[in-house]
Amino acid sequence: MTEKINLMNLTRQQMREFFKELGEKPFRADQLVKWIYHFGEDNFDNMTNINKKLRDKLKAVAEIKAPEIAVEQRSADGTIKWAMQVGDQQIETVYIPEADRATLCVSSQVGCALACTFCSTAQQGFNRNLTVSEIIGQVWRASKVIGEFGVTGIRPITNVVMMGMGEPLLNVANVVPAMELMLDDFAYGLSKRRVTLSTSGVVPALDNLSGMIDVALAISLHAPNDELRDEIVPINKKYNIKMLIDSVNRYLSVSNANHGKVTIEYVMLDHVNDSIEHAHQLAEVLKNTPCKINLIPWNPFPQAPYGKSSNTRVDKFQKTLMEYGFTVIVRKTRGDDIDAACGQLAGDVIDRTKRTAAKRQFGQNIDVQLQ
């Protein structure tokens, strides 16, 4: 028996080709995308503007399948974390409500291969890339849950950030089509400024990205010099800070989504990267790059070798950068009581890399495949 095609793996253009191959009019794809994403429908029989003959044909060859929720946890601050089942493993997706928006933090891989030393996900190792349906399916599943609770005042998703488990630019082949669906007016219709891709700095993939899609960009920098970044963000040994910042500036030069500015993410690690001297170094690194800087309180996880920067050290770091004219925001920690805060996502990962502590030191050995 031929395996059914999961229509969530297709962009609208790909679905139009799929319908042509079925001998049907391409506009049927527009209808189906609306049913799936506007109305959260995964049952062909409920698609009333599609005739029964076509519905029966679709049921024979296709399915609409998103990850199922295995566990839901709710924080006192309104944050919701879902562990979603993908095969025999789990990924994590986080809903973060705020006064004027609601952001969904989406995973791109089962685990992560980059081995950043301050991140819980990295300690789980890496298993595989998520498919398009497993990425966009996180948005679909979360929207469906929130829709069911809409009467209680839970805010619909307004923003999506590719900041969950994994490095998005090591899964370009699936992340970009998923983001296309986030932007597609027939699907979720989010503004390109409300879809953010966060990367630790896979420079060749970032250089290619501008020709594929225009979305908001966030850079996980976390250190102001190569010596320190080599240690805590090992991919820096392959693509150093200068290479990364040059690539960022190239992306900004052709992007409309970023308003000419990139977001720089900087986790505050006590007496590691949070001194006044580090702040001066960071200002020098970013002096020719229009940006806003997010200072992120570090969120602890078991066996981590770090401490959280004191409020005093964070304040001094922020003020030093602001004296240079930078916009600097100290991110409010959300969902830390359910381990849903930045750097705490772990999921349930079968590590295929079998990395040792020694291997983790060699970021230059990270295999970067551009797809």
From Swiss-Prot:
It holds the Pfam family Radical_SAM. S-adenosyl-L-methionine binds at G166, E167, S198, S220, L221, H222, N299. The keyword Methyltransferase applies. Disulfide bonds join C105-C342. One of its GO terms (biological process) is tRNA methylation. Residues 98-337 form the Radical SAM core domain. It catalyses: adenosine(2503) in 23S rRNA + 2 reduced [2Fe-2S]-[ferredoxin] + 2 S-adenosyl-L-methionine = 2-methyladenosine(2503) in 23S rRNA + 5'-deoxyadenosine + L-methionine + 2 oxidized [2Fe-2S]-[ferredoxin] + S-adenosyl-L-homocysteine; adenosine(37) in tRNA + 2 reduced [2Fe-2S]-[ferredoxin] + 2 S-adenosyl-L-methionine = 2-methyladenosine(37) in tRNA + 5'-deoxyadenosine + L-methionine + 2 oxidized [2Fe-2S]-[ferredoxin] + S-adenosyl-L-homocysteine. Gene3D superfamilies: 1.10.150.530, Aldolase class I (3.20.20.70). GO terms for molecular function: 4 iron, 4 sulfur cluster binding; metal ion binding; rRNA (adenine(2503)-C2-)-methyltransferase activity; rRNA binding; tRNA (adenine(37)-C2)-methyltransferase activity; tRNA binding. Its main location: cytoplasm. Reaction proceeds by a ping-pong mechanism involving intermediate methylation of a conserved cysteine residue. This is Dual-specificity RNA methyltransferase RlmN. It comes from Mannheimia succiniciproducens (strain KCTC 0769BP / MBEL55E).
